[in-house]
A protein has these predicted regions:
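Mid-domain Rossmann-like dinucleotide-binding core that forms the NAD(H)/NADP(H) cofactor-binding site
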Residues: 1-60
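Phosphate-coordination loops involved in phosphoryl transfer and adenosine-cofactor binding
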Residues: 8-11, 68, 118
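A short acidic, Gly/Pro-enriched loop at the edge of an enzyme's catalytic core
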Residues: 62-71
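Helix-to-beta-strand junctions that scaffold the AdoMet/dcAdoMet cofactor pocket
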Residues: 88-90
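C-terminal hydrophobic helical "lid"/dimerization subdomain
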Residues: 82, 128-178
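Glycine-centered, small-residue-biased loops immediately flanking beta-strands
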Residues: 92-93, 169
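Rossmann-fold NAD(P)-binding glycine/threonine-rich loop
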Residues: 99-118, 129-134
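Helix N-cap at the beta1-alpha1 junction of Rossmann-like dinucleotide-binding domains, i.e.
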Residues: 42-44, 78, 101-102
Length: 178
């Protein structure tokens, strides 16, 4: 998120309530900006709500067209991209945090909006580690709530299988646990 300046006066929406979206929402909320996390999974949205972050399901959020200064697309789905553009105000910034997975097209996107409304599009990867580590050290970002399951290293193969299952956020391997 270092490639975009987010100020406390900004309205920011994050699309996607997976690991990436939850982390982005927490980091953005620290700026003081009005932060909305949009997702489909009640249990994941509750994680953000416990941190004081506003949440919506996609249908409710869709009513807030052209309201946001910055929209972060972290769902990895073409529909997330389309929805992000609909939420963005003219001269807003669309941040792409994930690549699109699986089938689907973004043909429904009104490409003229990028030009007419002067939309900025920013691709954003993981960024520098030290600022992230500093936030973790201060306890500013809650990562414990993102750990769905823990396993000893001896069960590593099973843990890897579990990590790929729907609904599992993060799986933690403890090398010295039994």
């Amino acid at each position: 998120m270092e490639r975009v300046t987010i100020e406390s006066s900004h309205r920011v929406a994050i699309i996607g309530d997976g690991k990436l979206g939850l982390l982005c929402a927490q980091a953005i909320a620290l700026t003081g900006a009005s932060t909305l996390l949009i997702g489909k999974h009640a249990e994941k949205l509750r994680i953000a709500e416990r941190r004081g972050i506003e949440t919506n399901k996609p249908g409710t959020a869709a009513k807030r067209k052209r309201e946001f200064d910055v929209v972060v697309e972290a769902s990895g789905s073409p529909s997330g991209f389309v929805g992000a553009l609909e939420l963005l105000r003219p001269r807003g910034t669309l941040v792409l945090k994930s690549t699109f997975q699986g089938p689907g097209k973004i043909d429904e996107v009104d490409q003229a909006r990028f030009v007419v409304d002067e939309i900025s599009v920013v691709g954003s990867r993981c960024g520098r580690f030290q600022p992230a580590l500093d936030l973790l050290k201060k306890g500013a970002i809650d990562i414990d709530s993102l750990i769905s399951e823990e396993y000893p290293l001896a069960r590593g193969l099973y843990a890897m299988e579990r990590a790929g299952k729907r609904g599992v956020l993060k799986v933690l391997l403890r090398p010295w646990a039994n």
